[in-house]
Amino acid sequence: MMSTSSDAQLDPVEFIHSRIRTVPNWPQPGVMFRDITPLLQSAKAMRVLVDLFVERYVDAKLDYIAGLDARGFIIAPIVAYELSVGFVPIRKVGKLPYKTQRESYALEYGTATVEIHEDACKPGDRVVIVDDLIATGGTMMAGKNLLDRLGAVVVEGAAIVDLPDLGGSALLRGAGLSLYTVTEFAGH
């Protein structure tokens, strides 16, 4: 991580990139975990990050920002608040109390399922999906599929970090989802 004395010399994207810590061999050997907690611990970095998202979507005529469980919940509601739009949680299965739609997706070992309240948005609502990171793209694709099923217009998927070598961003773009990511890291 760079020292704060050099922060003024960095552009916003470089500044955000410099606040993401790489943790080797976590949660398992061979994985280079991209840890956003140092970014979250800095009020300045949070402001820069939120401003990047807000500037991107201020004129997009959105109805909602959807956040993916769990780290998407950190940034998405803040961006929704700043844009004066609603927030839609897309949760891990079994966490929402009302009637839901579910979508399962493949993980490296097994499957996972996310769900959304069936009345979370209505046909034609314009939504951006936000998460912390795009790796394999499975969670964001599941979120897109859920929103599509509700009739929403998924304007874009957005994340702080893209890990393009894992193929998720290519998969999502190949499925017709426009993407915005603040920064990217090579490798896993």
Curated annotation (Swiss-Prot):
Record's catalysed reaction(s): AMP + diphosphate = 5-phospho-alpha-D-ribose 1-diphosphate + adenine
EC number(s) per UniProt?
A: 2.4.2.7
This protein's pathway reads: Purine metabolism; AMP biosynthesis via salvage pathway; AMP from adenine: step 1/1
Q: Which Gene3D superfamilies match?
A: 3.40.50.2020
Organism of derivation? Burkholderia thailandensis (strain ATCC 700388 / DSM 13276 / CCUG 48851 / CIP 106301 / E264)
| Function comment | Catalyzes a salvage reaction resulting in the formation of AMP, that is energically less costly than de novo synthesis.
Q: Where on the tree of life does the source sit, at the highest rank?
A: Bacteria
Question: Which PANTHER family does its entry note?
Answer: ADENINE PHOSPHORIBOSYLTRANSFERASE
* Subcellular locations according to the entry: Cytoplasm
Cytoplasm as UniProt keyword: yes
Name the record gives this protein: Adenine phosphoribosyltransferase
Please provide one cellular component term from the Gene Ontology annotations of this protein. cytoplasm
Q: How does it assemble?
A: Homodimer.
